[in-house]
């Protein structure tokens, strides 16, 4: 899971124990639920909190086969039990969503304690002019609203993966005994990714990247001389919007892949809805910085549930191993904000080359923001040289994908934001590098 640079900077500044974002060993990568209070507790809408069925349209042989494989991999007796086991990582993600309110209330309590250090005269001014205590109380109310959404996400995931409450409670109790806290940041980043992938507000960030990728795929489809759909793989797919856009083009058999269980249970939540409905989240209440007006921080964003494309298949797990046995299988691999998440960049390149058919194409769009412990960190010119040496041939892309980065080289640069909050008083953008290469 890619986290925002601001979140990463905050985590690094706070010390080595603050960054609890889910990582992996071989790679860094309905209606609005109603709520009310009863006796000071959150009363949950039973309709909103009930079990939500998976999309019945997704009943193709490949979906059924992958679900069977997934449940086999999820069995605690399958493979070695450790913190990298998919069931353990799933329980950790459910732990995180379970403790959303607790972790965020702890931070709010810290803000309230800090406010007590303000002098009486200063506090009187703050209360009169901006009603600062009410501001903190409003944040608490929105934490409770977000908790309802988190519980809906969790309920859907527990049904999909067949996890019962007793097993989750045992995992949480063990974590508590070991002194481990739930991962606050990964849950927060997942809520923000709902904005980037599915909310109207995320359209600006999507529109800076998607047109280049989609038009490139359209041109590849046009030159395809068979009626069979082109097999496309999108690793590091997050909450899946790009994969669904590719499927909507027609003529593609789309497979998306994601390691992060936080992202995967978020995707399952989106995918469980087959009607045009929506849920509202308040994703920006976990930080006080960079807000022009307080209502920007408090605003709710609607996440629409338009009917998902039933042909998209999610394969969970590590990109480098999830597709073992599928050598020379895919016509196209699309890496969108992905390759720099690698622990071992060369392993990603090897996997891309291994999975592509001879003559298959790799489309890349993204930055080179390496994580905290990569085995190798290459500059762009080094990447181009390595990729060519591995047996890839660069082909030019349209000007829609940006200007040429190097004279005489078929790689382009396009500015692309990655910040989630379009109203923030800060901007984080990259000169994303775009290329199209063919396996020769």
Model segments located where?
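N-terminal accessory segments
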Residues: 2-226, 230
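Conserved class I S-adenosyl-L-methionine
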Residues: 225-238, 245, 253-258
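S-adenosyl-L-methionine
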Residues: 271-326
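Conserved Class I S-adenosyl-L-methionine
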Residues: 281, 285-286, 368-369, 373-404, ...
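A short acidic, Gly/Pro-enriched loop at the edge of an enzyme's catalytic core
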Residues: 320-333, 427
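A short glycine-rich, Lys/Arg-flanked "PGG" loop and its adjoining helix->strand segment in the class I
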Residues: 346-359
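Conserved beta-strand signature within the Rossmann-like core of class I S-adenosyl-L-methionine
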Residues: 359-371
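Core SAM-dependent methyltransferase catalytic element
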Residues: 390-391, 406-440
């Amino acid at each position: 899971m890619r986290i925002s640079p601001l979140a990463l900077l905050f985590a690094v500044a706070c010390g080595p124990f603050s960054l609890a974002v889910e990582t992996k060993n071989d790679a860094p990568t309905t209606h609005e639920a109603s709520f009310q209070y009863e006796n000071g507790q959150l009363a949950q809408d039973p309709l909103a909190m009930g079990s939500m069925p998976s999309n019945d349209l997704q009943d193709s042989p490949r979906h059924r086969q992958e679900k069977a494989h997934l449940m086999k991999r999820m069995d605690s007796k399958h493979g070695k039990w450790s913190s990298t086991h998919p069931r353990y990582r799933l329980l950790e993600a459910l732990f995180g969503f379970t403790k959303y309110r607790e972790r965020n209330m702890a931070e709010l309590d810290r803000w309230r304690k800090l406010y007590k250090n303000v002098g009486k005269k200063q506090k009187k001014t703050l209360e009169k002019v901006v009603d600062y205590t009410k501001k903190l109380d409003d944040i608490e109310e929105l934490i409770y609203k977000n908790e309802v959404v988190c519980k809906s996400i969790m309920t859907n995931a527990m049904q999909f993966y067949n996890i019962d409450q007793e097993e989750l409670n045992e995992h949480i109790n063990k974590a508590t005994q070991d002194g481990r806290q739930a991962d606050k940041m990964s849950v927060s980043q997942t809520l923000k990714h709902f904005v980037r992938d599915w909310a109207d507000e995320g359209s600006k960030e999507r529109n800076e990247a998607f047109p280049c990728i989609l038009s490139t795929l359209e041109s590849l489809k046009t030159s395809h001389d068979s009626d069979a759909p082109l097999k496309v793989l999108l690793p590091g797919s997050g909450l899946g919007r790009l994969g669904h856009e590719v499927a909507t083009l027609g003529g593609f058999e789309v497979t998306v892949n994601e390691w992060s269980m936080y992202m995967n249970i978020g995707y399952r939540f989106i995918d469980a809805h087959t009607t045009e409905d929506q849920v509202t989240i308040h994703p920006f209440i976990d930080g006080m910085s960079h807000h022009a007006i307080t209502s920007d921080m408090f605003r709710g964003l609607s996440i629409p549930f338009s009917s998902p494309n039933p042909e998209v298949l999610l394969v969970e797990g590590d990109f480098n191993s999830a597709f073992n046995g599928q050598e020379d299988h895919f016509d196209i691999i699309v890496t969108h904000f992905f390759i720099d998440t690698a622990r071992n960049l060369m392993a990603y390149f090897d996997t891309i080359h291994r999975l592509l058919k001879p003559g298959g194409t790799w489309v890349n769009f993204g930055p080179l923001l390496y994580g905290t412990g990569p085995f190798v960190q290459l500059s762009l010119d080094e990447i181009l040289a390595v990729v060519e040496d591995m047996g890839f041939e660069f082909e030019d892309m349209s000007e829609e994908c940006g200007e040429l980065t190097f004279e005489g080289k078929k790689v382009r640069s396009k500015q692309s934001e990655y910040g989630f909050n379009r109203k923030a008083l800060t901007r984080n953008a990259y000169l994303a590098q775009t290329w199209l290469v063919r396996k020769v």
